[in-house]
Regions:
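Hydrophobic ligand-binding cavity/cleft-lining segments
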Residues: 34-131
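Conserved aromatic-histidine-acidic binding/catalytic patches
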Residues: 68, 72, 212-216, 220
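Compositionally biased, intrinsically disordered linkers/stalks adjacent to structured regions
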Residues: 215-218, 222-244
């Protein structure tokens, strides 16, 4: 019969201290983020010169929160935008974990419906509307919703009704997929999300929601960038090979 190895209590205590310290640090960082997001709500950063989007401005010139991302892609704008529209966001385990975490926090149920794989088709199946499309350049999508609800409904509106929508109790969200040319065979992919509440009550609810849960929303936007770049550049390389 083997001899049982004595437990190293000092190592165990040290490990627990590190775990506790790590959890405390994570909580402190998150708390600081929530406080910052709360204080900055309603003071969204205005776009830099290269970020200005007159197409998006048609539908939401004023907004209370904004998230912008961009990435250079070695592929023409048309290929980049197509890759963005067709990417399968749901195949990412991290994205799935974020959706499940949100449902758990708000007391909702994960959406187990069978959804289309392409990003544009997915958003439309959820209720989003294409407000404007410029082929090979930009898509502007929009919806109105109550994002703080456990299982929110995304309500699409006709383009001509979106900008003027002011029904109390809602948040209007506009989101773009955009590819700007950057030389003869490259592009800058851009994604921008804007949101504004329609009244004081919705603003109070959305401010709390955004302050606490926007890290997951922002992370989803950023997680799509590298897979998009890889797929667009793969398509561009395949097209160049086919031409030679």
């Amino acid at each position: 019969m083997g001899t049982r190895r004595p437990c190293d209590h000092s190592a165990l205590r040290s490990g627990l201290r590190w775990l506790t310290a790590g959890a405390g640090l994570a909580a402190a960082v998150y708390g600081a983020y929530v406080g910052t997001a709360w204080s900055r709500y309603g003071r969204a950063r205005r776009p830099a010169t290269d970020e200005v989007d007159p197409l998006l401005d048609r539908f939401m010139p004023e907004y209370e929160v904004v998230e912008r991302n961009h990435l250079r892609v070695a592929a023409p704008p048309g290929i980049t935008l197509a890759a963005a529209s067709e990417m399968n966001l749901l195949e990412s385990r991290m994205v799935g974990a974020i959706f499940r975490g949100r449902a758990l926090i708000l007391g909702g149920r994960p959406d187990d419906s069978t959804r289309p794989h392409g990003l544009l088709a997915l958003m439309q199946s959820l209720g989003w509307t294409v407000l404007l499309e410029v082929p090979d350049h930009e898509l502007v999508l929009g919806c109105v919703t109550k994002p703080w609800e456990p299982s929110p409904t995304f309500r699409g509106l006709p383009p001509e009704a979106f900008a003027a929508f002011a029904e109390p109790g809602y948040v209007k969200i506009a989101w773009t997929l955009r590819a700007d040319p950057d030389g003869p065979a490259a592009s800058i992919f851009r994604s921008e999300t804007r949101a504004i509440a329609t009244d004081r009550s919705a603003r109070a609810r959305f401010r709390l929601y955004w302050s606490c849960l926007s890290p997951g929303i922002i992370l989803i936007r950023r997680l799509m960038l590298e897979p998009l770049k890889a797929e667009a550049e793969r398509r561009a390389a395949a097209m160049n090979t086919a031409r030679t």
